C-alpha cells in the first residue's frame, strides 16, 4: 500500500517546502450547509465559532447547557481542534422554549447565530467548506505560484487526506489487525474509523495508479462518470467515448474511482480490469470490507477547488482561499503545492 506522502502527484512532486498551520489562525474553516434553517421545528441549529476545541467536546458542552443527553446534539462533520472553525451544531429540544444562548460560556467558543429547524442535522449533510489557509516559510515562491495556476486549471487528485488514516496511520493499522483476527470489534467509533480508513486507502491507491498514466483523464471503455457536483454516475461505452471526453475536458463530467466494498464496483470492461489490478495486492483490506458488508461506491478522481485565490504577504508567506465540496480534503490541495513541515494527520477535516 502506497503511503499518503508518496501517492502520485498530479503536477509532479513539489520543489520546495513550507509550513502548514504554524498556529490555529493559519487554518480557518467555515462550514457551508447549503441551506438555511426552517425557522420552526423541534431542533435548534446553532452556528458556533471555535478555537482550541474539538467538535465532540463542544457538542457535549452544548448538551450539558441545554440539559439534554449528548446523543441529542448532532453535527454534519468533525472540525479540527487546532484551527479556527465555524460550524453548525443541532440540538433536539422538543417542547422547550428557545434558550438564552448568550449564557452559553465555553472558553474558545462563541455562539454566532441560532434558529429552529424541522430536521436533525446528520453527519455529511453539508454542501462543503470554505478554507482560508496560510502557508509559511515557503522555500520556492516561483514553484508554488506556478502550481497554483496549474491547480486552478487542472485541479488536484481527490485523495482522502492523511487525517483519515489516523496519527501514524493508526486507523489503517487497526483495520489491518482487525482483518486478520476473528475477534469482533464492538466499539462503534473504532469500527467506523477503521473501515473508513481501509476503503479510503484502496481508493487512494487506485487514483495514484491511474495518475501514473500520461492519459489518466482520458475516458476508457467501462469508466464510470459523474456529473460535476452530483452523486449519481453512469458507465461509458466505446461508442460514446468522443462525446464523453469532450464533456470531461470541459469539466462537465468527472471520471470516478472505486470505493471498494460489497456489490458491483460500477466500472466495467477495461476500466474495471484496471481498478482490480491497481489493488490486486491488497487482498486483506478488500476481504475486511466484504466481511463487514461495506457497500461499494464511487468518488470523483479529481478535485477542482472553487473560488481559488491567493495573496502573497511576502516572498515566504501566502494566504490561500478556496471552497471544497463535503468529503474533500484541503491537505490534498496543499500537498500539490509544498512538501510540508509537520504531520498532516494532526489536521482534522
UniProtKB/Swiss-Prot annotation:
EC number from the UniProt entry: 5.4.99.27
Reactions catalysed, as given in the entry: uridine(13) in tRNA = pseudouridine(13) in tRNA
Keyword Isomerase attributed: yes
GO molecular function terms noted in the UniProt entry: RNA binding; tRNA pseudouridine(13) synthase activity
Domain TRUD positions: 155-303
Family: Belongs to the pseudouridine synthase TruD family.
Record protein name field: tRNA pseudouridine synthase D
Species of the source: Salmonella arizonae (strain ATCC BAA-731 / CDC346-86 / RSK2980)
Amino acid at each position: 500500500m502506497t503511503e499518503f506522502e508518496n501517492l502520485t502527484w498530479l503536477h509532479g512532486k513539489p520543489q520546495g517546502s513550507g509550513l502548514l498551520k504554524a498556529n490555529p489562525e493559519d487554518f480557518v474553516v467555515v462550514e457551508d450547509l447549503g441551506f438555511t434553517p426552517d425557522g420552526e421545528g423541534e431542533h435548534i441549529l446553532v452556528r458556533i465559532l471555535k478555537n482550541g476545541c474539538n467538535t465532540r467536546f463542544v457538542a457535549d458542552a452544548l448538551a450539558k447547557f441545554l440539559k439534554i443527553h449528548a446523543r441529542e446534539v448532532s453535527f454534519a462533520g468533525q472540525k479540527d481542534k487546532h484551527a479556527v472553525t465555524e460550524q453548525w451544531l443541532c440540538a433536539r429540544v422538543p417542547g422547550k422554549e428557545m434558550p438564552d444562548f448568550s449564557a452559553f460560556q465555553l472558553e474558545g467558543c462563541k455562539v454566532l447565530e441560532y434558529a429552529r429547524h424541522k430536521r436533525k442535522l446528520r453527519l455529511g449533510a453539508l454542501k462543503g467548506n470554505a478554507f482560508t489557509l496560510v502557508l509559511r516559510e515557503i522555500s520556492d515562491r516561483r514553484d508554488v505560484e506556478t502550481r497554483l495556476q496549474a491547480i486552478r486549471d487542472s485541479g488536484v487528485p481527490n485523495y482522502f487526506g492523511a487525517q483519515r488514516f489516523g496519527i501514524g496511520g493508526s486507523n489503517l493499522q487497526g483495520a489491518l489487525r482487525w482483518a486478520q483476527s476473528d475477534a469482533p470489534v464492538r466499539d462503534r467509533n473504532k469500527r467506523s474509523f477503521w473501515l473508513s480508513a481501509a476503503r479510503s486507502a484502496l481508493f487512494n491507491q487506485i487514483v495514484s495508479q491511474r495518475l501514473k498514466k500520461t492519459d489518466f483523464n482520458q475516458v476508457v471503455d467501462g469508466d464510470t462518470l459523474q456529473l460535476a457536483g452530483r452523486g449519481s454516475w453512469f458507465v461509458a461505452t466505446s461508442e460514446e467515448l468522443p462525446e464523453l471526453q469532450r464533456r470531461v475536458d470541459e469539466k462537465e463530467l468527472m471520471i470516478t474511482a472505486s470505493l471498494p466494498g460489497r456489490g458491483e464496483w460500477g466500472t466495467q470492461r477495461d476500466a474495471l480490469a484496471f481498478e482490480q489490478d491497481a489493488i490486486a495486492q491488497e487482498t486483506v483490506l478488500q476481504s475486511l470490507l466484504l466481511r463487514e458488508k461495506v457497500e461499494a461506491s464511487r468518488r470523483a478522481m479529481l478535485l477542482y477547488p472553487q473560488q481559488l485565490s491567493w495573496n502573497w504577504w511576502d516572498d515566504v508567506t501566502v494566504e490561500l482561499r478556496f471552497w471544497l465540496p463535503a468529503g474533500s480534503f484541503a491537505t490534498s490541495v496543499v500537498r500539490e503545492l509544498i512538501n510540508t513541515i509537520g504531520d498532516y494527520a494532526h489536521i482534522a477535516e
